[in-house]
Amino acid sequence: MQIGPYQLKNQLIVAPMAGVTDQAFRNLCLRYGAALAVSEMLSSNPEVWDTDKSRQRMTHSGEEGIRSVQIAGADPELMAQAAQFNVEQGAHIIDINMGCPAKKVNKKLAGSALMQNPPLVKDILQAVVAAVDVPVTLKIRTGWEPEHRNGVQIAQIAEDCGIASLAVHGRTRQCMYKGNAEYDTIKAIKQNVSIPVVANGDIDSPEKARFVLDYTGVDALMIGRGAQGRPWIFREIQHYLETGNKLAPIEVAEQRQVMLEHLTKLYDLYGEYKGIRFARKHIGWYLDQEDQRQFRADFNQLETAAEQYSLVEYYFDELVQN
């Protein structure tokens, strides 16, 4: 798949997820085979660009691969300025968020709320594309609500405005993350535009990845929640797409190494206090089985990086011995 001048090495992309796809997580996913990892959403409001959270999200030092930065907002001029600012900070691709279903984003008429207003969608896309000399991509949902799936209309507007590729989550804004993603609308979008289309939603196994590619005819897949606590899913899916065979489950020693490295990267990125808190949710995703409940409870009580690191080491030492 090609996005502007950038040829992706395969069909697997990491979905942008606020509070999840920071630099530490993106680099892990890239190492395990993702072709592209999109950053966390950044507000187009310049008043928040100087906050610690925004500065961390804008940091690209040590970033591996193609740098795609997602921006969100509802004002065409501010969105254009945000795009320019992030290109100056090192973004290779600007991604526009019209897919986030969160209430705090939608109440500002941003994210997937924009799909209710096609003229404003057009104004925003035209402004951002004109403002930068890098490819601009777009992420949407299938529509605002099940009765109003206007994804094809928005996709055609995107193509007319010069959007380089389009990612579509297979639910409406109203659906949030409930129920199952549907791929009929994504298939229809692919059939009605000539720009690359990326399918997103409930792609959590190699078999599901193969099904979605075949059913929709899309150019690539975007994986979000399926990679939480499992960055190696990209390796598993790519192997299956290439060979038709499933890889053996990740070995305990490798999982231990990944988790400990992830902890270290979180502490380095956020400092000990914030790093500890981010580590709690990531470790909760890595070890999410019922028989790991006590470990999660114990881990979440720890207040130092050294204690967290040591407990993960101890957990895997016990696992190997038993």
UniProtKB/Swiss-Prot annotation:
Q: What is the required cofactor set for this protein?
A: FMN
Keywords from the UniProt entry: Flavoprotein, FMN, NADP, Oxidoreductase, RNA-binding, tRNA processing, tRNA-binding
Question: Under which EC number(s) is this enzyme classified?
Answer: 1.3.1.-
Under the heading InterPro entries, the entry gives: Aldolase_TIM, DUS-like_FMN-bd, DUS_fam, DusB, DusB-like, tRNA-dHydroUridine_Synthase_C, tRNA_hU_synthase_CS
- Can you say what this protein is called? tRNA-dihydrouridine synthase B
- What protein family does this chain belong to? Belongs to the Dus family. DusB subfamily.
List, from the UniProt record, the residues annotated as the active site of this protein: C100
Against Gene3D superfamilies, the record matches this protein to:
Aldolase class I (3.20.20.70), Putative flavin oxidoreducatase, domain 2 (1.10.1200.80)
User: What Gene Ontology molecular-function terms does this entry list?
Assistant: flavin adenine dinucleotide binding; FMN binding; tRNA binding; tRNA dihydrouridine synthase activity
- Where in the chain are disulfide-linked cysteines found? none
Q: Which reaction does it catalyse?
A: a 5,6-dihydrouridine in tRNA + NAD(+) = a uridine in tRNA + NADH + H(+); a 5,6-dihydrouridine in tRNA + NADP(+) = a uridine in tRNA + NADPH + H(+)
Q: Which Pfam families match?
A: Dus
Species, as recorded: Shewanella oneidensis (strain ATCC 700550 / JCM 31522 / CIP 106686 / LMG 19005 / NCIMB 14063 / MR-1)
Q: Kindly give the SUPFAM superfamilies that the UniProt entry links to this protein.
A: FMN-linked oxidoreductases
Instruction: Spell out the HAMAP family in the cross-references.
Output: DusB_subfam
What PANTHER family does the record point to? TRNA-DIHYDROURIDINE(47) SYNTHASE [NAD(P)(+)]-LIKE
- Positions contributing to FMN binding: P16, M17, A18, Q70, K139, N200, G201, D202, G224, R225
Job of this protein: Catalyzes the synthesis of 5,6-dihydrouridine (D), a modified base found in the D-loop of most tRNAs, via the reduction of the C5-C6 double bond in target uridines.
The record's section on CDD domains has: DUS_like_FMN
